[in-house]
Amino acid sequence: MTRFLFAIILGFLLTACQQVTVEETEYVPHKLTELRVGTLYGPQIYMTSGQGNSGFDYDMAVLFAEYLDVPLKMVPYTNRAELYDALKKNEIDIIAAGMTETPARREQFRLGPPLYRVNQVLVYREGMPTPKDITDLKGKITVIADSSFVETLTQLQKRHPTLVWDQVTDKDSEELLAMIANKEIDYTIADSSSVQINRRYLPDLRSGLVLEEKLDVVWLLPPTHSDSLMSQLLAFWHQEKLAGTLDHLNEKYFGHVKRFDYIDTRAFLRAIETVLPRYRQLFETHAGDLDWRKLAATSYQESHWNPNARSPTGVRGMMMLTQPTAKEIGITNRLDAKESIRGGAAYLRDMINRLPESIPESQRMWFALASYNIGYAHVEDARKLAESMELNPNAWRDLKKVLPLLQKRKYYQKTRYGYARGSEAVHYVDSIRRYYDTLVWVDNQSKQQNSDEEEPSDLASEDGPAPVPGTLSPDKPK
């Protein structure tokens, strides 16, 4: 019965997803021996760094290639016009670039099922007057050419004929957001998810008017001769939706960035410049098989990198260790930065090793940090509670929902270890994830800057502009 219903849904989606009205071009059959995915650079789309590849679209593309049982080839482009042209010419099989569904795209391409939703927001800088209306702007709007933002402005212009804007072809959304923060332009339009991610590094960004709400982010397929690929994509999407993959990736890339503290973010960026250099070598030395930046992020959350930090509850030092924990791991002086960092790393590593093997490697750190905060026993209580509620005890996205319940008598009276401040643990882990993301960004920026200084400026690549800061150069489109 389930298969029958899915077949009906699949057929409906294939025929009703959209009607594409484009000119027929000569079609050269392409046997799918690899999945060629056209994309753009961006932290939520596709990035490459020393830690490997990442991005919501990239992670989904990896899974789709595995589903099709073919190798994946990511092909990044520098602008949307080239990307669209490549798809129409059959140089790529699909576009996965964080693009929203729009009428113009629906007319030109076939649109895949929704991955997540975003709002389109007007972005301005801290200190500027808050716009009350699109006509109440004290400056000019700058947007990316061929973007969905141009479509939005074009529609708004019909109601507000005096509305004007600039379009750029040699910048991406990340660069425009940086230009807002650096006072180089007045306004831009961006997806809400992009603003949430980038304000961790650019805290002066502000979201103003919501111009479009709840837009689906989708993949684009060729307008013709793509029935088979669309059918496979829909079946894959259905499978991953049921498996919770979309929820997992949504939490992975966006779940921890929704909270934002302007003052804290600015203070953290200052601390990276002024305080971290004194202790970075200690974090790198004692991290061992851990990412030193996760260790440093944990330390900042604990003590703001203050080796003399103390709390009324008796925890002390850079890693805010309790006396029993320090004794257990052989630390004699908790106020010594070197000992505290060494002890914190050892304790965190022990938390990771104690976790059940059923917890995926990519999520073990978040479970371990929750254990570091409220204790391993309470995390195990939460996992058992999740299981009883038919949630996944091995998925951080589900544990985040359950941990706050440990503060409610209805739930904690059924657990072995009782009450715990579970909501505090969720906030604790989310904060560390934000600090970690910022450290990775700053570290990559520094490496890119050092690399640029080492290379002669007249040896520019003929392939076009370099990747965004913090990325390595994967295959360029031929």
From Swiss-Prot:
It comes from the Bacteria. One of its GO terms (biological process) is peptidoglycan catabolic process. Its EC number is 4.2.2.n1. Residues 451-461 have a biased composition (Acidic residues). Keywords: Cell outer membrane, Cell wall biogenesis/degradation, Lyase, Membrane, Signal. The active site is at E302. PROSITE patterns: PROKAR_LIPOPROTEIN. Residues 446-478 are annotated as: Disordered. It is an enzyme of class 4 (lyase). The N-terminal domain does not have lytic activity and probably modulates enzymatic activity. The C-terminal domain is the catalytic active domain. In the N-terminal section; belongs to the bacterial solute-binding protein 3 family. In the C-terminal section; belongs to the transglycosylase Slt family. This is Membrane-bound lytic murein transglycosylase F. The lineage of its organism: Bacteria, Pseudomonadati, Pseudomonadota, Gammaproteobacteria, Alteromonadales.
